[in-house]
């Protein structure tokens, strides 16, 4: 494959096959293409519009180059990020809450465009995010939760990171993170920053082995379930795709403005989540609970979002103790104790 020829084709609007996309991604992952050419290819893909086959090809390459695990009977809540709104770490809080009743392998990274990434949030709690493959399975079996740090499990991404940083725009790699959990989680809630990508990601997911994937995009532009307006939902169940909208104000009553859910940094996000779990921040509590309701539905533990919302109250109330248990087994519990003591 000649990368220059690929760039020429992409600029002419010609899409790649799944096999071609994987071969191209392999070359990028291996550092075999000069950075200026990689930048051109990523921008050309973006301008043309990434197809499901191109996404699948890149996903398969990333999975092949990742450190390997087999923890398929798990749930993940990793999303695309990049909505630019800066809400509290609701997907990570959701993962922690749901892990009380279903095994969770949370895939995540440090903040790129947000104020607090999942890795930053967990570190602020005292959780050790550097969990190698040889320890991940035992940690999951003991605690029903493990965090898989993207920088550790996708070492080949170091060949792409400088280009992505210089470009400063979303590329195909923003879509790949949530689809490349090294655990191979068969169930996932995936927040998507852009509504047009929902269908593309769903079509790609049909060929990626999910038992249940629920993609969500909430008004006004959230890559999460929205407490303010409608949430656009695409369910992938085996070979079936279903699209619909849901207004969670039917469950929570008065809508919650997104402006009440923003955070300034990881520690602030941690404090807001803990306050919510203690019943002292109603807006954040509702935000977490509706996201937990969708995760419980995705895990197959409830039949609808309303039942999930009812169960979520108990799980959210248990969060402080749940977090302390997880951190005590893998991290520095003095951090979470100090934060709890300051609230």
Curated annotation (Swiss-Prot):
Transferase found in the keyword field: yes
UniProt family annotation: Belongs to the anthranilate phosphoribosyltransferase family.
Enzyme Commission code: 2.4.2.18
HAMAP family according to UniProt: TrpD
Gene Ontology cellular-component terms listed: cytosol
GO biological process: L-tryptophan biosynthetic process
Pathway: Amino-acid biosynthesis; L-tryptophan biosynthesis; L-tryptophan from chorismate: step 2/5
Designated gene of the protein: trpD
Gene3D superfamilies linked: Nucleoside phosphorylase/phosphoribosyltransferase catalytic domain (3.40.1030.10), Transferase, Pyrimidine Nucleoside Phosphorylase, Chain C (1.20.970.10)
Record field: transmembrane: none
Entry protein name: Anthranilate phosphoribosyltransferase
Catalytic activity from the UniProt record: N-(5-phospho-beta-D-ribosyl)anthranilate + diphosphate = 5-phospho-alpha-D-ribose 1-diphosphate + anthranilate
Binding positions (anthranilate 1): 79, 109
Residues where Mg(2+) 2 binds: 223-224
UniProt remark on cofactor binding: Binds 2 magnesium ions per monomer.
Co-factor requirement: Mg(2+)
Subunit structure: Homodimer.
Pfam families, per the entry: Glycos_trans_3N, Glycos_transf_3
Ubl conjugation found in the keyword field: no
């Amino acid at each position: 494959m000649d990368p220059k020829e690929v760039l020429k084709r992409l600029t002419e609007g010609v899409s790649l096959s799944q096999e071609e996309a994987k071969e191209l991604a392999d070359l990028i992952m291996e550092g075999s293409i000069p950075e200026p050419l990689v930048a051109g290819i990523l921008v050309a893909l973006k301008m043309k519009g990434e197809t499901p086959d191109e996404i699948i090809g890149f996903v398969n390459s990333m999975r092949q180059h990742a450190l390997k695990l087999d923890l398929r009977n798990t749930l993940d809540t990793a999303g695309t990020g990049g909505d630019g709104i800066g809400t509290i770490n609701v997907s990570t809080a959701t993962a922690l809450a749901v892990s009380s009743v279903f095994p969770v392998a949370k895939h995540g990274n440090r903040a790129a465009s947000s104020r607090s990434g999942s890795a930053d949030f967990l570190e602020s709690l005292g959780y050790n995010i550097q969990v190698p493959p040889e320890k991940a399975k035992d940690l999951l079996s003991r605690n029903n939760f493990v965090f898989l740090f993207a920088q550790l499990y996708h070492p080949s991404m170091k060949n792409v990171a400088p280009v992505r940083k210089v470009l400063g725009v979303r590329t195909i790699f923003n879509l790949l993170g949530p689809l490349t959990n090294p655990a191979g989680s068969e169930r996932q809630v995936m927040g998507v920053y852009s509504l047009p990508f929902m269908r593309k990601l769903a079509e790609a997911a049909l060929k990626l082995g999910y038992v249940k994937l629920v993609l969500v995009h909430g008004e006004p532009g959230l890559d999460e379930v929205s407490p303010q307006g409608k949430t656009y939902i695409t369910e992938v169940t085996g070979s079936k795709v279903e699209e619909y909208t849901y207004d969670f104000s039917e469950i929570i009553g008065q809508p919650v403005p997104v402006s009440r859910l923003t955070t300034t940094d990881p520690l602030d996000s941690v404090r807001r989540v803990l306050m919510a779990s203690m019943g002292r921040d109603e807006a954040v509590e509702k935000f977490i609970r509706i996201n937990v309701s969708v995760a419980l539905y995705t895990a197959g533990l409830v039949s609808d979002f309303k039942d999930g919302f009812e169960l979520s109250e108990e799980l959210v109330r248990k969060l402080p103790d749940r977090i302390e248990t997880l951190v005590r087994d893998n991290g520095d519990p003095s951090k979470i104790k100090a934060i709890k003591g300051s609230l």
